[in-house]
Regions:
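Histidine-acidic metal/acid-base catalytic patches
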Residues: 1-29, 52, 78-83, 136-155, ...
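Active-site beta-loop-alpha junctions enriched in small/polar residues
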Residues: 6-10, 37-39, 62-66, 92-94, ...
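Active-site acidic/histidine proton-transfer and metal-coordination neighborhood
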Residues: 24, 33, 57, 65-156, ...
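Generic beta-strand hydrophobic packing signal
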Residues: 34, 59-61, 184, 221
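Domain-start "cap" segments at the beginnings of catalytic or binding domains
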Residues: 35-40, 44, 51, 66, ...
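Active-site-adjacent beta->alpha loops and helix N-cap segments on the catalytic face
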Residues: 40-50, 96-98, 102-103
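Short, well-ordered alpha-helical microsegments
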Residues: 43-45, 72, 142, 208-209
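Short acidic, glycine/proline-enriched helix-loop-strand junctions
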Residues: 43-62, 122
Length: 251
């Protein structure tokens, strides 16, 4: 299991003048790879070079439904050539989730995109949010999505904070979908007065002694903190998460 940072965590420091130094600092914290929230205006080769130059692996790049609809096989070819393995869909709007009027259409579009991706050795994943855990029949909308699309068409990228704030047990859900989750987002949080607050991993309310063993089948665990907290900037939050996880994982 390798340790990565979803670089969205440091999104304020990814401008052309900052990106290389940001990646250098990410490597210095002890991260082995980064997951990109998109191509950031670069070509696949250009983004991969910047990542590799910092000593980091580029293993996963997020996509959205516009990308799925466009189904650009040239981009897929470029990503596959650079060693990317996974293309997580970052989120789906309500109308495209189970129970929404475009759910069946969405499943068809994902099947088409996934088939092209699979020909290139890429697997499409789905990154959940709390709204994906809304009830749908006897299960949740996330369950319904995974029931509609098998794991070789749509894998999982579970997010621990969103599972928790969505009202399910992260440990239980990680176990439930362990066989289709090669990448897992590790995110900590608190709930104060019904409001969610992000925290460095190990600083919130999540049960890491239960969560980390439940991640053992994953190839990558990926820290993400949407906004900094505790009076720390985003770099210090990411470093604090890395230090906690390196100790827990024996890295």
């Amino acid at each position: 299991m390798k340790l990565a940072l979803q670089i969205y965590t440091l999104r304020q420091y990814l401008g052309a003048d900052d990106i290389r130094e940001t990646l250098r600092k990410t490597k210095e914290m002890g991260y082995e790879g980064v997951e990109w929230p998109g191509l950031m205006g670069y070509s696949p080769a250009g983004l991969a070079k910047i990542t590799r130059d910092a000593g980091l692996e580029m293993f996963s790049v997020h996509i959205n439904m516009d990308d799925v609809i466009a189904c650009d096989t040239d981009v897929m070819d470029g990503l596959a050539a650079e060693g990317v393995k996974w293309l997580p869909i970052g989120w789906l709007p309500d109308v495209r989730l189970a129970g929404g009027e475009l759910f069946e259409e969405t499943c068809g579009l994902i099947r088409k995109y996934s088939a092209e991706a699979a020909e290139r050795g890429l697997l499409v994943l789905y990154h959940n949010h709390d709204f994906d855990l809304a009830p749908c029949g006897d299960a949740t909308r996330l369950d319904a999505l995974y029931a509609a699309l098998p794991g070789d068409v749509l894998g999982a990228e579970p997010d621990t904070c969103w599972l928790y704030s969505g009202g399910v047990d992260p440990v239980e859900y990680l176990g439930k979908y362990a066989d289709r989750a090669p990448v897992i987002h590790l995110k900590d949080c608190v709930k104060e007065g019904g409001r969610k607050g992000y925290k460095p991993v190990g600083s919130g309310v999540l049960d890491w002694d239960g969560i980390l063993p439940a991640c053992e089948k994953a190839e990558w665990v990926c820290v993400e903190q949407d906004d900094p907290s505790d009076g720390l900037d985003a770099f210090r939050c990411a470093a604090k998460s890395a230090a906690f996880l390196k100790e827990k994982l024996g890295k």
